[in-house]
Amino acid sequence: MRKQLKRFERCAEKSLALQEGMVKLAFFDVDLKNSKLLFEQENFDEATFADNFVVKSGEWSVEDGWVVGKNPDMCPGMIVSQKDFFGNVMVELTAKMVAPSTHDINVMINGEWDEEKDCRGYAYVAGLEAFWHGNVGFEKSPEYKLTAATPLFRFEPEKEHNFKMGNVDGKVFVLVDDELCLEISDPEPLDTSLYGKIGFEAYSSWWKFKGLKVYKLKYEKIEEYYNPEF
């Protein structure tokens, strides 16, 4: 059972926990340090890109170790993984805009590609400087009825950002530069034994990534409670 902390204690504990590889969510502790690394590719070339991804839409290339996505259209320009990563997973990458583009770095986990409709099917999707108003945001595809967004992260398009997106039993979380930006509970979680694709999307944007890692998450369910204050 996890005790309640005062605000200054809570902020300090979260910061220290992230430094030690622990993400504290409501009712879950996610142990990043001891999670299983399923995939890692620091720098890409044409061969490693082709081995690991399929281009579905948009323009995608490799430049100086970076995977570069360019799509001027008002729709997803996507690449999808060749391999499935089933279960409770997290994707980590280093991402950066390509000038003059300033928005929409988008990532998919626990997804699928609907070949019949030629579009993304079921999936969890998160975006940085996205969702129309410069938000860190989340949406559940394909109905997009479950969404969340916050404008509070201070995005710098010329800077490299560390982006993490994970899912634990329908508890989806997003960290940017080791700040927990979003935590969403899906009341009808996707079946992660069926949906295992990861993907990357340029939505009317131009950006690049490298340092890609995929983890099978280690976590512990926690009972939360408050200490009486009066």
Predicted segments, located by residue:
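Extracellular carbohydrate-recognition regions
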Residues: R2-K56, K221-F230
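Extracellular beta-strand elements of beta-rich domains used
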Residues: F44, L93, K210-L217
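Short tryptophan-centered beta-strand motifs in secreted/extracellular beta-sheet-rich domains
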Residues: F44, V91-L93, E158-V176
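Short carbohydrate-recognition loop motifs
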Residues: G58-G77
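Secretory/extracellular carbohydrate-interaction modules
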Residues: N71-E139
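Beta-strand-rich interaction surfaces with strong enrichment in secreted/lumenal proteins
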Residues: G77-K83, A149-F155, I198-G199
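Short, aromatic/His-centered strand-loop micro-motif at the edge of beta-sheets
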Residues: K140-N162
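Flexible glycan-contacting loops in extracellular carbohydrate-active proteins
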Residues: I184-G211
